[in-house]
Structure formats: structure tokens, C-alpha cells
């Protein structure tokens, strides 16, 4: 039996953060994909585990079926409990430990929410709302500018090494091309566009460095297979 059960969805970015962390730490897991069109994430079974009814939700069968949700909280849990070799984290007594936590909060409040809303209004919303698309695309560029400034003198966010702080940004940054595509609307008005590599070269290079990790490649290969099923 696998150590973990991961409630997930093939399309959503957040579960794939957890998948990569599990792969980085060589931990075994079984994935349960929910069907959003059938509202399976709101099933009684899942709500009993996660009252927010969203994914990811992780169950640790080696810890009395301990259950935790919210992707960045899961990253902290896995790092604190299972990253004994500090492959993707820092020890609690490291002077920059709390910087890792800082960037996880920044990812959740700065990147995840904004990228998600930008994608919603470009791809899923029922009507074209130019003001919303403009606002969220501009906010994406602001957040990328913050990262660009942070990365001006370093290759990674914390302690000049890969940690869960970096990992947390990967899957949402992979969605930038989709977010800035035309989407389902024909937009005649002028809205913000993005040339990731040209406008934010340090952040783009950082993202490519993260994607080159073996666990990253394995994660997104797994996602591609899940999308095909």
C-alpha cells in the first residue's frame, strides 16, 4: 500500500506541487482524481476529509491517516516530517528557515490567487469582463516584477538552494501561456500581454531551472498522462 493518498485533479496547478514534493522525497502515493463536472470534490467522503471541498487533500497512512489540505501547508508538513536529508527544505534552526515560510505565503496570496483569477476571467467566466482581465494580468506582471527583483542576486529564493519555496511557484507559472492566450473570448480591446522571457529574464531562467529538475519532469509527465485519460 502506498504511504499517501492524494485527492487531486489533473488540470489544477495546486495538486501538482504536492506530487513534485512527494517525488523529490521518494515517497509513495496513490492519486484519487476528482471529477469537477460531477462536483466530486464536494462529495460527503471528501468533505469529511477537507471541509473546504477543494484539492489537494493528502492522507498520510504512516501517521494514523493524518489528513492535511492546502497545498503549501502540505509542503511544510512533508518537509518537516519526511525531509530528513533536507533535499527540499531547511532545518528549523537555519537562520533563513522562516524565509521559506515567507515565500510560501507570498506564493499563496500573491501568485496563486491572482493567477487563478486571471485564468478564470480569461477561460471560464461566462462573459467577457475587460476590466477584470486587465486588472489581474497587470497584477501578474507586478508579482513577476517582485520575483525579478528578488532573483537579481540569487539563483533560488532562499539560501541559494532549491527548497519548497521555489517548488511552490512552478505549476502556476506553467499556466502563464494559457492565462495570456486569447482564451474563449475574442478580445478587441487592448489588454496587457506578456513576453515572459523578455520582460522578466531572471524569473524566466529560474523557472526553466526548476523545470529541469528530474522530479519536475516526472511530475509534468504524470500530469500529461492524467489529462489524456
From Swiss-Prot:
* Record keywords, A-Z: Transferase
**What is expression of this protein induced or repressed by?**
By heavy metals such as cadmium.
Name of the top EC class for this enzyme: transferase
Q: What does this protein do?
A: Involved in the oxidative stress response and detoxification.
What EC number(s) has UniProt assigned to this enzyme? 2.5.1.18
Q: What is this protein called?
A: Glutathione S-transferase 1
Record lineage? Eukaryota, Fungi, Dikarya, Ascomycota, Taphrinomycotina
Q: Which InterPro entries match?
A: Glutathione-S-Trfase_C-like, Glutathione-S-Trfase_C_sf, Glutathione_S-Trfase, Glutathione_S-Trfase_N, GST_C, Thioredoxin-like_sf
Amino acid at each position: 500500500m502506498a504511504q499517501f493518498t492524494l485527492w487531486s485533479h489533473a488540470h489544477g496547478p495546486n495538486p501538482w506541487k504536492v506530487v513534485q514534493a512527494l517525488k523529490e522525497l521518494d515517497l509513495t502515493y496513490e492519486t484519487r482524481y476528482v471529477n469537477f463536472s460531477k462536483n466530486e470534490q464536494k462529495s460527503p467522503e471528501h468533505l469529511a476529509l477537507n471541509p473546504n471541498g477543494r484539492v489537494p487533500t493528502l492522507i498520510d497512512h504512516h501517521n494514523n491517516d493524518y489528513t492535511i489540505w492546502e497545498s503549501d501547508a502540505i509542503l511544510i508538513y512533508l518537509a518537516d516530517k519526511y525531509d530528513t536529508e533536507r533535499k527540499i527544505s531547511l532545518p528549523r534552526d537555519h537562520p533563513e528557515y522562516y524565509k521559506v515560510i515567507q515565500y510560501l505565503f507570498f506564493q499563496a496570496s500573491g501568485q496563486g490567487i491572482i493567477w487563478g483569477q486571471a485564468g478564470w476571467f480569461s477561460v471560464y467566466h461566462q462573459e467577457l469582463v475587460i476590466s477584470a482581465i486587465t486588472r489581474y494580468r497587470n497584477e501578474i506582471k507586478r508579482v513577476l516584477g517582485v520575483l525579478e527583483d528578488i532573483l537579481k542576486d540569487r539563483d533560488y529564493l532562499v539560501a541559494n538552494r532549491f527548497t519548497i519555496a521555489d517548488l511552490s511557484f512552478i505549476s502556476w507559472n506553467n499556466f502563464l501561456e494559457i492565462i495570456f492566450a486569447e482564451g474563449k473570448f475574442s478580445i478587441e480591446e487592448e489588454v496587457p500581454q506578456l513576453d515572459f522571457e523578455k520582460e522578466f529574464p531572471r524569473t524566466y531562467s529560474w523557472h526553466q531551472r526548476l523545470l529541469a529538475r528530474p522530479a519536475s519532469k516526472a511530475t509534468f509527465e504524470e500530469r500529461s498522462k492524467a489529462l489524456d485519460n
